[in-house]
Each structure stands twice: as structure tokens, then as C-alpha cells.
Amino acid sequence: MDKKAARIRRATRARRKLQELGATRLVVHRTPRHIYAQVIAPNGSEVLVAASTVEKAIAEQLKSTGNKDAASAIGKAIAERALEKGIKDVSFDRSGFQYHGRVQALADAAREAGLQF
């Protein structure tokens, strides 16, 4: 099993459990160059809020889009957008990535900005 298949296996197990709970998910995806965050409805059919370093307004404010500072900016942005829509409680879906580095920075920034998970 290669690295990507193992990550997808971990993500599938976590998502299955979150679907059973019927929780609104804060999903994180990272690539070497960018980081993405989405708040997804409990049934999984609708993206309620999204933010990423691909967005021009966010990318222009950052020195680099693939570091912890960028992840923190995305965490803050996703939390602000979710709170505007009345979403306060979410479950954190790390998509099989280790809770470390950029993923952790995004989660910490989202918590500081008011999201609860």
C-alpha cells in the first residue's frame, strides 16, 4: 500500500464515522503549494462554506501559499465565513493527514476565530 492509498483509507474510516454521527464537517485538504478548507453539510451533498489559498484575495495577502502562515489565514477565513452563515459547531475532518504542521495550524486558527470542534 502506497502513501496516498493509506491516507485515503484513513480518511474513509473517519468520514464513515462522521456520517453516522450526522455531523457538519470541516474538511481540510493540503497539497505542497496550497491548502483548502470546506464546511460540508451532514448529508455530504452540499458545501456550505469554502476557503483556500487559491483565492486571489487571500493569496495576495500571503508571502507563500504553502506554509503554516497560509494555513492559519485559511483557518481564520473559514471560521469567519462559517459563523456568518450561523455554523458554530463542526467536526474536524483532517482527510487522513497527520494532525501536525499546516493541518494543526489551520485547526488552531479556526478555533481561535470561534469555531467549536
Swiss-Prot record:
Residues forming coiled coils: none
GO MF annotation terms: 5S rRNA binding; structural constituent of ribosome
Pfam families on file: Ribosomal_L18p (PF00861)
Origin superkingdom: Bacteria
Keywords: Ribonucleoprotein, Ribosomal protein, RNA-binding, rRNA-binding
GO CC terms: cytosolic large ribosomal subunit
Alphabetized InterPro entries for the sequence: Ribosomal_uL18_bac-type, Ribosomal_uL18_bac/euk
The UniProt record lists the keyword RNA-binding: yes
GO biological process, one term: translation
Function: This is one of the proteins that bind and probably mediate the attachment of the 5S RNA into the large ribosomal subunit, where it forms part of the central protuberance.
Similarity annotation: Belongs to the universal ribosomal protein uL18 family.
Name of the protein in its database record: Large ribosomal subunit protein uL18
